From Swiss-Prot:
This is 7-methyl-GTP pyrophosphatase. One of its GO terms (molecular function) is nucleoside triphosphate diphosphatase activity. It is an enzyme of class 3 (hydrolase). The active site is at 70 (proton acceptor). Its EC number is 3.6.1.-. Gene3D superfamilies: 3.90.950.10. The record marks 13, 71, 153 as: Important for substrate specificity. Keywords: Cytoplasm, Hydrolase, Nucleotide metabolism. Pfam families: Maf. InterPro entries: ITPase-like_fam, Maf-like. Nucleoside triphosphate pyrophosphatase that hydrolyzes 7-methyl-GTP (m(7)GTP). May have a dual role in cell division arrest and in preventing the incorporation of modified nucleotides into cellular nucleic acids. Belongs to the Maf family. YceF subfamily. It catalyses: N(7)-methyl-GTP + H2O = N(7)-methyl-GMP + diphosphate + H(+). It comes from Xanthomonas oryzae pv. oryzae (strain KACC10331 / KXO85).
């Protein structure tokens, strides 16, 4: 019998991605403070938050394996949060126009007496965007809940010149290649 698997997230995007691995799982809401610590690098922030999310749910469900994931976008080493407002999304997209944005996507798998962690780096080269293009994009797909102010799985892909990544699912928020490796290491049966 396979151990119980929990996704420590309420994100529909992550739930949809995890379902691609064809494992039964439940979800749990992680209650963590997502504020960066002073001087914390974007990759360290993503790794810490992924681990904290998994741990926050694992403590409530002893014996289960819990997946936590987090993504932090950075432009020139400066973390970009979820915009939350249209004005902030406009500002982020304007700042990223014609530039490369790095997305640090971390995943943690916490189970009985064991923790496994991975980190994926994806680089997105945005094309030069006009203010009108930014407005049209935000009218069509206001990605206010997404790091970087776009949804790569939707119309946001039209903002890109290129993506460099070992794992295309990482940009959506859950690096399945790394997660599948961690799950196999933990004893889950995957091809």
């Amino acid at each position: 019998m396979m151990p119980r698997l929990i996704l420590a997230s309420t994100s529909a995007y992550r739930r949809q991605l995890l379902s691609r691995l064809q494992l039964e799982f439940d979800t749990g809401r992680p209650e963590v403070d997502e504020q960066p610590q002073s001087g914390e690098a974007p990759s360290a922030l993503a790794s810490r938050l992924a681990a904290e999310k998994a741990a926050a749910v694992a403590v409530r469900l002893p014996g289960a394996w819990v997946i936590g994931s987090d993504q932090v976008a950075d432009l020139d080493g400066q973390a970009l949060g979820k915009p939350g407002t249209r004005a902030q999304a406009q500002a982020q997209l304007t700042a990223m126009s014609g530039r490369t944005v790095r997305f640090h996507t971390a995943v943690s798998l916490i189970g009985p007496e064991r923790e496994l962690h991975a980190l994926d780096l994806t680089e997105v080269q945005l094309r030069a965007l006009t203010p009108a293009e930014i407005e049209r994009y935000l009218d069509a797909e206001p990605a206010l809940d997404c790091a970087g102010s776009f949804k790569c799985e939707g119309l946001g892909i039209s903002l890109f010149d290129a993506i460099r990544s070992q794992d295309p699912t990482a940009l959506v928020g859950l690096p399945l290649i790394a997660l599948a490796r961690l799950l196999r290491e933990a004893g889950f049966h995957l091809p």
